[in-house]
Design a protein with these regions (language model features):
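Feature targets compositionally biased, intrinsically disordered low-complexity regions
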Residues: 12, 30, 60, 71-75, ...
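Extended, low-complexity, intrinsically disordered C-terminal regulatory tails
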Residues: 40-72
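Catalytic cores and adjacent binding grooves of peptidoglycan-active enzymes
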Residues: 76-133
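Intrinsically disordered, low-complexity peptide-like regions
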Residues: 18, 55-57, 84, 121
């Protein structure tokens, strides 16, 4: 089972989860205070950040189930567990981000390429999953 930590955006928002990521970056865009984040998702994102040497923009991290439904997310989305993030890096193609993410999660984790929307979905699930959105 993937470890997931719970935080409060109000109390813990500025808390560093790694060198370059804080709790508030993973918060649901609906304003909910609760934030759930899997440490191994943070590890993957930090590795991506370090590899490309550029800021990783988290477009969507944790989502409450109602917010996930509102934005058209699938039932049981990894976002609703705190194990997923949709990311983009200015000046780096989604194909390059996805290829690197796949290389550091050879036997686990999900990587979805959303070329038209300009982001990559990365998640810390226990099994391997790859797709193009």
């Amino acid at each position: 089972m993937v470890e997931i930590n719970a935080y409060s955006k109000k109390k813990d928002g500025a808390k560093k989860l790694s060198t370059n990521f804080t709790v508030k970056e993973f918060a649901c865009n609906d304003g909910t205070d609760a934030v759930f984040v899997a440490p191994r998702l943070v590890m993957v994102l930090q590795s991506i950040r370090s590899h490309f040497g550029k800021a990783v923009n988290i477009n969507s991290g944790y989502r409450t189930p109602p917010y996930n439904a509102q934005v058209g997310g699938v039932d049981g989305s990894q976002h609703t567990y705190g194990t997923a993030a949709d990311i983009s890096i200015k000046g780096v193609s989604v194909a390059d981000v996805a290829a690197y993410a796949r290389s550091i999660m050879p036997d686990w984790g999900g990587v979805g390429i959303y070329k038209e929307q300009g982001f990559v979905h990365v998640d810390a699930r226990e099994t391997r999953a790859d797709w193009n959105g």
